[in-house]
């Protein structure tokens, strides 16, 4: 875990210069790499992207039940886990959002900040680095959860901190790694940890200007119990107009970071996998003003 904190420290030290450079973009000829990914998520995982300046993005993440029962429940479509979120791009480097997930009735607020940006020209930098911070609150009724929820409000809180480090290698291929630390205030047994570290990998390969194949995968960096499954998702993107439509197959049903990283329970060998989709719509508030905030 110490390596994750070291990576955070290094990125913050470099990002001070990068953010100052952004304020002076007009003074130098710097070409920043664009569209490493089509949307703000790869499949389950966050991507390097944020909404464009003065753009509000609305995203629906819909995950069906397990496909293992086949036509009996139409491959899980009788059941669903859903997440909605809004995120707003204030400028080229900062976005703020809020969402709600049906799993554990979690409401959350999140920030995405571009600390470093891949660029060429006068300033040549090989990677992009984005910091993702999220705080969530479980709002289950007390009867639905452990009695400890009613003892203290803070027991309902979750904290997610993630670095997204990636590179667009060419017009078709983009890859990223996601060192992640999740802190949960409430654990159910003495053997469970409050703080959980994991490492994610994600990529995109563009087939056409509108269509791409995506995948993400997470592994733990410390011990988990025997029920833990490494989370994965594989799918495709299709962009049309202001919409990005993503379809995926995953071993995790919950679309929120904590649920798909730490609570994936699917097993390909038994057919316990979950079909899902993301759809996002962008709303621009730029009007006739070409100046960014």
Residue ranges and their predicted role:
Residues 4-6, 29, 209:
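Alpha-helical protein-protein interaction elements
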Residues 156, 195, 206, 226-227:
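Low-complexity, polar/charged sequence tracts that form flexible coils or short amphipathic helices
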Residues 7-9, 166, 203:
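Small side chains
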Residues 1-19:
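Bacterial Sec-dependent N-terminal signal peptides
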Residues 208-214, 225, 242-246:
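Substrate-binding/catalytic groove segments of enzymes
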Residues 16-150, 157-161, 166-177, 181-185, ...:
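Transmembrane beta-barrel domains of Gram-negative outer membranes and organellar outer membranes
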């Amino acid at each position: 875990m110490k390596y994750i904190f070291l990576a955070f420290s290094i990125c913050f030290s470099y990002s001070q210069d990068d953010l100052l450079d952004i304020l002076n973009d007009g003074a130098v000829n710097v070409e920043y790499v664009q569209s490493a990914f089509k949307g703000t998520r790869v499949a389950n995982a966050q991507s390097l992207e944020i909404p464009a300046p003065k753009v509000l993005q609305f995203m629906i993440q819909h995950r069906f039940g397990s496909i293992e029962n086949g036509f009996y429940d139409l491959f899980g479509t009788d059941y669903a886990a859903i997440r909605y979120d809004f995120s707003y791009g204030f400028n080229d480097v900062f976005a703020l959002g809020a969402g709600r997930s049906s799993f554990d009735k979690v409401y959350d607020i999140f920030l995405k900040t571009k600390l470093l940006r891949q660029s060429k020209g006068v300033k040549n930098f090989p990677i992009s680095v984005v910091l993702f911070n999220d705080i969530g609150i479980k709002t289950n009724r007390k009867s639905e959860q452990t009695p400890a929820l009613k003892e203290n409000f803070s027991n309902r809180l979750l904290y997610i901190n993630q670095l997204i480090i990636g590179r667009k290698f060419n017009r078709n291929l983009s890859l990223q790694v996601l060192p992640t630390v999740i802190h949960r205030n409430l654990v159910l047994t003495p053997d469970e940890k409050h703080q959980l570290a994991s490492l994610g990998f994600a990529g995109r390969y563009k087939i056409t200007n509108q269509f791409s194949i995506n995948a993400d995968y997470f592994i733990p960096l410390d011990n988990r119990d025997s029920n833990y499954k490494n989370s994965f998702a594989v799918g495709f993107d299709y962009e049309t107009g202001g919409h990005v439509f993503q379809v995926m197959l995953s071993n995790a049903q919950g679309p929120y970071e904590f649920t798909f990283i730490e609570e994936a329970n699917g097993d390909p060998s038994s057919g316990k996998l979950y079909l899902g989709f993301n759809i996002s719509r962008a709303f621009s508030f730029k009007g006739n003003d070409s100046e960014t905030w």
